[in-house]
Amino acid sequence: MAATLKSLKLLRYQAFCSPSAFGAVRSVSYWNASSTQHGGQDPPGHISLCHSAKKVKNICSTFSSRRIPTTSSARPGLEFSKTSSSKASTLQLGSPRATGIDEENVEVFDSFENLRVFLQLRPEYRVHSYSASETSQLLSVSEGELILHKVRVNQNNLQAQVIVDYLCKLSSLPAEQHPVLLGSTSFALLCQLSVRKIKLFDTQDLINVLKAFVILGIPHSHSMLDVYETKCCHQVWEMSVDQLLLVADLWRYIGRKVPRFLNICCSYLNLRWKDLSLSQLVHLIYVIGENRQVSQDLMQKLESLILKYIDLINLEEVGTICLGFFKSKTNLSEFVMRKIGDLACADMQHLSSHSLVNIVKMFRFTHVDHINFMKQIGEIAPQRIPSLGVQGVMHLTLYCSALRFLDEGVMNAVAASLPPRVAQCRSKDVAKILWSFGTLNYKPPNAEEFYSSLINEIHRKMPEFNQYPEHLPTCLLGLAFLEYFPVELIDFALSPGFVRLAQERTKFDLIKELYTLDGTVVIECPDYRGNRLSTHLQREGSELLWYLAEKDMNSKPEFLETVFLLETMLGGPQYVKHHMILPHTRSSDLEVQLDVNLKPLPFNREATPAENVAKLKCEHVGVSLTDDLMNQLLKGKARGHFQGKTESEPGQQHMELENKAAVPLGGSLRNVADKSGAMEMAGLCPPACMQTPRMKLAIQFTNRNQYCYGSRDLLGLHNMKRRQLARLGYRVVELSYWEWLPLLKRTRLEKLAFLHEKVFTSAL
């Protein structure tokens, strides 16, 4: 494999290392301060040092008010300047917190040291990680000037080991001199010489030079580092696991992603994974997570190692493992997640808030409902939230909504803590928090203050929403679930300009979100006169959502049986229509229409062949409720109600409410029979005698994912749908999972009787 890599990279490697690439050494500064930054991105496909040198600006102007001559006669004393040092100290290029980063990495860099706390908890980590606390004997300014003088004088005769030694020594200069050193053309020359000699560096040389780069704050976007990554790629198979992890850690400290290097590391570790120690395992997962790069095959092997060491892992390491798997978008099995939940619950009071948030992220990602963990979150989170960073609060809130876990204490603490510090929120935080409250269909006691502060923050952050357009529809839908409709923002979100921006700038398809928003505002804001989604996009959204809903429902045998039983009870498929009454609400319904006599109408023309329409007569079809059939149905009255048990969430029996018995058939069915005489069901009338429906029923086949966890409270989207159906004159008939699913095991007559009760009692 190493040979293959070498052959693939050889041409590029030679281009970087060829001495002919440095013809512009003395005329142009080496540093590319204005180049495109690589933070969070893959390095460019090909970068020539010579080409880079020809187009870059001289970084000396950033750090020093004068140019430094590069001839061998230049006085060493001119290299360092107290005044230029004070000017240069305004920016530390090497600090991760000073580098340009995209939104998704803000949290990573802002909490850089928190992410590395686990490295301080075992001495074994020192062998394969870099610590900023490492110290060496300081080099005086005069000694540094002398080294740079030697570089200029002896540039054609410097050996590889001497170059490495010079770089390491210069990194020992006082910190305030580092920016001045970076502005020195002599130091740029030294770095160029290091690239020229890099083929002669061994693994330890590479490590020492990378450490020097970390200390000095070499810009992570510098093209020279691409040469070093290539060298690291060639060196992988000569490294030990400890050296491999240390090199990866140094790249992390520099702030540059090195995908080629990590790909080869994964191949290397796929062969040696069984020999990883606990500290190596945790550190490797950290490195994989921070680089968002993963081999699924390797991650499965690492999961088995987690189980091997599970009893030895401390809580900070648990948080690191969860974060690594979360960032690499890799699942942990339910079994492992329950083990992790048990560890966290055993000592949650001593679990740091940082690790708590990381564990919460992974539970959200895997959708594992660890009941004891959820309970303890409900107890401990309200105490932690006031001191938790805004992004941590967002992740905690999003965890609750993803698992449909409504704990009012947690949500109230979030709502109380946010208004005073809402300015600290990113657009992403505002969006996810509003979405979470809306999804759980929960208004906190301070709803007015809470929502006004967040809506105002949306207005203030409009430039950021333009940069990350996917967050604006999320905000507005979260608000719409709870009947908040900021018209100006909705008008902007549905404007052609923003829709076009959303399609161009985001990797997410926002048509579903915008279509849901568009359909909602039409029904709930009749006076709205703002922008609407184009007809083309409305049709596209409708077709997409119907395809998904139809595919989902038709894959459920219990739903198909329900449709068949309704058709049987009412008289045929023309009396029932499976469609999306409100396409923008993302779920389908079974529609039934009743006339003034509460008899079903054959309104579903799609289910009636055209050649048969003319033959339809007002003849009775369907099931006639004769005295014998009524007696059979009513026999169960003496035995009491059906005892169908609710299917509960996994392991949540003690959280579920008491199961209600199914609706009794006796009295109510008699009442229906009394009101409708013989109660012969469903007379089929031809179109000529079709009546305007007195009542339109939306029969909804629900499941537990439409309710808050362990309760019968609808989630925001489904509650909004029922609200809108009512506005349009529909009466919702709910076939709830806790009633209907147990009944599917009963006889056909019992199912028909239950459906009859549901349909016709709702009409009364």
From Swiss-Prot:
Found in a complex with GRSF1, DDX28, DHX30 and FASTKD2. Associates with the 12S mitochondrial rRNA (12S mt-rRNA). The modification N6-acetyllysine is found at K507. Pfam families: FAST_1, FAST_2, RAP. Its main location: mitochondrion. The keyword Methyltransferase does not apply. Residues 697-757 form the RAP domain. Keywords: Acetylation, Mitochondrion, Mitochondrion nucleoid, mRNA processing, Phosphoprotein, RNA-binding, rRNA-binding, Transit peptide. PROSITE patterns: RAP. The modification Phosphoserine is found at S95. GO terms for cellular component: mitochondrial nucleoid; mitochondrion; ribonucleoprotein granule. This is FAST kinase domain-containing protein 5, mitochondrial. It comes from Pongo abelii.
